[in-house]
Amino acid sequence: MNKFDVVVVGGGHAGCEAAAAAARIGVKVALITLKPENLGEMPCNPAIGGRGKGHIVKEVDALDGLIGYIADQAGIHYKMLNHTKGPAVWGPRAQIDRALYKSAMYSTIMNYPNLTTIFASVEDIKVIANKVTAVIVNGKEIYCQKVILTTGTFLSGVIHRGKEQIKAGRLGENASYGLSNTLSELGLRLGRLKTGTPPRIDSRTIDYSKLEEQPGDLIPTPFSEITKKVLVPQIKCYITRTNEITHKIIKENLHLSAMYSGQIQGTGPRYCPSIEDKIIRFSHNASHQIFLEPEGLNSNTIYPNGISTSLPSDVQENMIRTIEGLENCKIIAYGYAIEYDYVDPRQLKHSLEVKSVGGLYLAGQINGTTGYEEAAGQGIMAGINAALAVKKQDPFILDRTDAYIGVMIDDLTNGIDEPYRMFTSRSEYRLSIRADNADQRLTPKAIDLGCVSQLRQEVFQKKLSKLNTLRDYVQSLTITPKQLQNCGYQISQNGIARTAFSLLGLPNFGINIVKDIYPELNRYDNNLLLLLTYESKYHVYLERQKEDIELFKQEETYQIPQDLNYDQIPSLSIEVREKLKQYQPETIRAAKHINGVTPSAIMAIIIFLKTKYLNSSITDKK
């Protein structure tokens, strides 16, 4: 076979989601990756989800993606983060058994309809008249209409450990230099980023009696709406800390760290700093927490989350043995930093297609993100849009009001200067785009696109029907303050009757109290009552937020034609014109985010567009 509609390069989290999404829409897809064992690889921490990240997993699942469902087949320690705060910022997270995850992903991808897997290296991309036509594998052309690059850290990757430098995409695997050259030759701006990983420890050499236990949630909350119950055995994690002796060893050897010797030029992740960064940036802290995370039920490998490092191996040995519980530990693999090329994501459309090269899409770390979840979110969007383009359909765009995926892509296309990680704080509309309502927000859109399985559609529609029925019922149940008092519950004596729905959201009430007042609610699914509780809690705020969303939508609908000649707008300065030509914003809102583009320049563009297009096509979606 040497002809496909879509070719996906790379079999990590972005690549698997991209390939599966395009295949679900019904086009012919090839996924090209080096080795079978690369499918679904988790090269860094053995965990999925977290604050903001867990929201993306739920959103990918709502679009019938893979990451959540596969994680539920491999999750060994579930924990809902931020549970003491409001439901909008709860972060579902799970430790993952690497072997189980890879096995489940391999089985899924290898048996996916419309998807062919090729184990090889892509040497080059063929572009004719600024459109992709093929990829080059083993000197031969594989023809295609669309290419999705999901190369992770493999673009000109270099591993650093002390003064040691190894050309690799990750430890033990060759980097890709040809594709970096190809992207440069296509005129794309590349940058350099860095990430890191800690040493791995043999669990049999740890003194657990000195450590703090960290149990998971008593009842695991699955990521996927398809998962009825998590069946994988659950285990504990453990916590220890660095100390002043640890910090002393690190400080004395900072000159040997690849990060601090000037050897690494790439920018590292602000929110996942190396242990060297931590003791310098947070020198006032006497210690730093380390989470000891098992890599699997049948694995002796422990991932010490919190001490990624690029120090030499001997320094890592000395450092780690100063930590309580790890005094006699055996290191299985040493930590390292990895530096790699990424493409400035301002060169992408919101569909993740490269503006200057038709049919070329980018997803994952190649766009400057960090994390499996961010990669999966981009992968599924790139896959959907590549397939829609093959079918000559409009792109599928999620904006900031729709999803965290929309927030991420909007942030990326407006430009980044460090590895991008998702947090709930990045969203202005987080009350509306919660993890618990991801399917209600996105699954109907996915059904319309045709990228949802029959099973997913049936599960969703059944749940939605039950939820709507229950919502109508609890809104029909009313009770006066006097009646509540007779039931033993105090509320403001203003004579206004409350519905059971409104009671669910009151601070001193909740499901159990409302069930006590209305025992007939005991026959309904408790999970559905929980969803209505969240709706009730945020009801007033959501009504207010609707106005903000309407304003956002108005601004977002002002499209800027790609062929607009900015030289025809006389009031724009030379600097503003140059920046607008460079970044080619698709909307007025995107233009506002370009550094140096002034409010007066924005107004000049709007006036020009209204005059030129007579108030019509500038509000038409492309």
From Swiss-Prot:
Main site of residence? cytoplasm
- What biological-process GO terms show up in the record? tRNA methylation; tRNA wobble uridine modification
Q: Which Gene3D superfamilies does the record associate with it?
A: FAD/NAD(P)-binding domain (3.50.50.60), GidA associated domain, C-terminal subdomain (1.10.150.570)
Q: Which domain of life is it from?
A: Bacteria
Q: Which GO terms describe its molecular function?
A: flavin adenine dinucleotide binding
Q: Where in the cell is it found?
A: Cytoplasm
The reply to whether NAD figures as a keyword in the UniProt entry is yes
- Decide whether keyword tRNA processing is in the record: yes
Report residues binding FAD: G10, G11, G12, H13, A14, G15, V122, S176, Q365
SMART domains the record matches: GIDA_assoc_3
| Pfam families named in the record | GIDA (PF01134), GIDA_C_1st (PF21680), SAM_GIDA_C (PF13932)
Q: Where along the chain is NAD(+) bound?
A: 268-282
**Cofactor dependence:** FAD
Name the keywords, alphabetized: Cytoplasm, FAD, Flavoprotein, NAD, tRNA processing
Q: Which InterPro entries does the UniProt record give?
A: FAD/NAD-bd_sf, GIDA_C_N, MnmG, MnmG-rel, MnmG-rel_CS, MnmG_C, MnmG_C_subdom, MnmG_C_subdom_sf
* GO CC, one annotated term: cytosol
Could you say which protein family the record assigns here? Belongs to the MnmG family.
Function, please?
NAD-binding protein involved in the addition of a carboxymethylaminomethyl (cmnm) group at the wobble position (U34) of certain tRNAs, forming tRNA-cmnm(5)s(2)U34.
Question: How is this protein named in the record?
Answer: tRNA uridine 5-carboxymethylaminomethyl modification enzyme MnmG
Say which species the protein is native to.
Orientia tsutsugamushi (strain Boryong)
